Amino acid sequence: MESGAYGAANAGGSFDLRRFLSQPQVVTRLVSMVLALIVFSCIFGEGYTNIHTSDQLYCVFNQNEDACRYGSAIGVLAFLASAFFLVVDAFFSQISNATDRKYLVIGDLLFSALWTFLWFVGFCFLTNQWAATKPQDVRVGADSARAAITFSFFSIFSWGVLASLAYQRYKAGVDAFIQNYVDPTPDPNTAYASYPSASVENYQQPPFTQNVETTEGYQPPPVY
């Protein structure tokens, strides 16, 4: 992890494209974008077909419109969300407020965890509907249907990795906050430092003073 709050460099640095593209969450997010693009493109392109006795288009997944709607919806939203968080990753190091960084990382964590679950549901749903589809009802789009199912399966892992990376950044930010703002507990075994001994300074007679000598006895007055 880079130094700084929530896994990013301190604010104020210049943007480094090579360093940005080498970040694990950026690479995984780009992969997730490509997978989502393939899924909804397959459904939009060849996810609807007609049967022999009708010209009306039906969803290729067992003629279940909900299957096509669900697969295309999570694919489009996953693509848009990946693009949004990719922009956030690009400008994340320019955000100086640690609270704003925390909320963005939490949003990334929650969304990635939710979409991991939704991709799992989508994979199971599409697989179930495809298994129930009659081969004679599929004139075109069989390969696209299989591709949508396959890349839905891969999306489960890509979004799971994104959730894990977001959690690591969140934990790094919390640990840094604790180290910086919580006073450490003193060690009872550590001896207290001794106070320096007071130095005794010799008394010095102040300047511009005369010694007053006192003599005992009578002194005769001067004779003129």
Curated annotation (Swiss-Prot):
Record-annotated disulphide pairs: none
Location within or outside the cell: Cytoplasmic vesicle membrane; Cytoplasmic vesicle, Secretory vesicle, Synaptic vesicle membrane
Statement: the UniProt record of this protein carries the keyword Zinc: no
Residues found modified as N-acetylmethionine: 1
Domain MARVEL: 20-171
Domain of life: Eukaryota
GO biological process terms held by the UniProt record: protein targeting; regulated exocytosis; synaptic vesicle membrane organization
A cellular component annotation (GO) from this entry: synaptic vesicle membrane
Tagged with keyword Acetylation: yes
Residue(s) carrying Phosphoserine: 3
Matches recorded under PANTHER family: SYNAPTOGYRIN, SYNAPTOGYRIN-2 LIKE PROTEIN-RELATED
Function summary: May play a role in regulated exocytosis. In neuronal cells, modulates the localization of synaptophysin/SYP into synaptic-like microvesicles and may therefore play a role in the formation and/or the maturation of this vesicles. May also play a role in GLUT4 storage and transport to the plasma membrane.
Entry protein name: Synaptogyrin-2
Organism (species): Mus musculus
